[in-house]
Amino acid sequence: MGEWAFLGSLLDAVQLQSPLVGRLWLVVMLIFRILVLATVGGAVFEDEQEEFVCNTLQPGCRQTCYDRAFPVSHYRFWLFHILLLSAPPVLFVVYSMHRAGKEAGGAEAAAQCAPGLPEAQCAPCALRARRARRCYLLSVALRLLAELTFLGGQALLYGFRVAPHFACAGPPCPHTVDCFVSRPTEKTVFVLFYFAVGLLSALLSVAELGHLLWKGRPRAGERDNRCNRAHEEAQKLLPPPPPPPPPPALPSRRPGPEPCAPPAYAHPAPASLRECGSGRGKASPATGRRDLAI
C-alpha cells in the first residue's frame, strides 16, 4: 500500500491546476481504480493461475492453455493501465515544480530589471500562464489517448465476460482439453465494473479537454485586458513630463544712428552748424555775399 499512497500523493498535487472536471477525474482515479484494485482486485485475481484446472496430466498442457486463455493477467494489465494514466499528470507536476523553482530564483532579478513597469511584469506572467496551460492540455490529451487505448485493448483481449469453460487444443496437449476458470461470475462483475469506470474516466477527460479549450481564449483576453488596464493606471500615476525648453531668442537689431546725427563720441557742434541738408544750401549764398562785402 505504500506505493499506492505515494502515487496518490503525486496525483493529489494535480488538483491545484485542475478545474472541477479534472478533480472529479482524480476522485474516480483514486477511489474507483486505485483503492478498489488494491483492496479487491488482488484478492479476486491472485489465484487465477493456480485455480485454472484442466482435465489432463500432460506436462505443460495446463500452462499452455492458461496462456492462450489469458495472454495477459487482468490484474497486471490494469496495473500497467493505472501507471500509464498517472504518467502525464505526474510529469505535469514535475514541470510545475521545476518552473516554480526557476521563477522563485529569478524573481528578485526580474524585479530589479523592471521596477514599476507593468508591461514588463504582465508579459512574462501571461507567457508562463500560457505555457502551463498548454502543458496541462497536453497531459489531458495523453491521458485520454491512454484511456481509449487500454479500453480497446481490454475489449479485444478479454471481452466483457469471463467464461467458466475454455476448450484448449494444440501442442503439447494430446487432444482437445477442457479447462475451467475459478469464480467466473465474480471476475465478470469486476471486469464490467472496471470497464465502466474506464468509460466514465474517458468521458471526464473529454469534458475537461473541451472545458479547457472553451475557457482558454476568453481567459487570455481577460488577462490582456487586465494588463492593459494596469498599464494605463500606472501611466496615470506617473508625474507629468517637464515642459519643453523655450526656443532660443533671436538677436535683436540695435537701431542705428540717424543719418544726420553725429556719432556719440564726437564733440557737439555749434548751433549754427547743426543745420544740415537744405538749410546748409540756403545759408551758403548769404555767407558768400557777406565775405565779398568785407
Swiss-Prot record:
The protein's name in its UniProt record: Gap junction delta-3 protein
Free-text function comment from the UniProt entry: One gap junction consists of a cluster of closely packed pairs of transmembrane channels, the connexons, through which materials of low MW diffuse from one cell to a neighboring cell.
Sample GO molecular function, one term: monoatomic ion channel activity
Biased composition annotated in UniProt, kind: Pro residues: 238-250
Gene Ontology annotations for the cellular component aspect, listed alphabetically: cell surface; connexin complex; plasma membrane
SMART domains associated with the record: CNX, Connexin_CCC
Originating species: Homo sapiens
GO BP terms: cell communication; cell-cell signaling; gap junction assembly; negative regulation of cardiac conduction; negative regulation of heart rate; response to glucose
Location relative to the cell: Cell membrane; Cell junction, Gap junction
Gene: GJD3
Sequence ranges on the Extracellular membrane side: 46-76, 158-188
Region Disordered, residue ranges: 233-294
Protein family (similarity comment): Belongs to the connexin family. Delta-type subfamily.
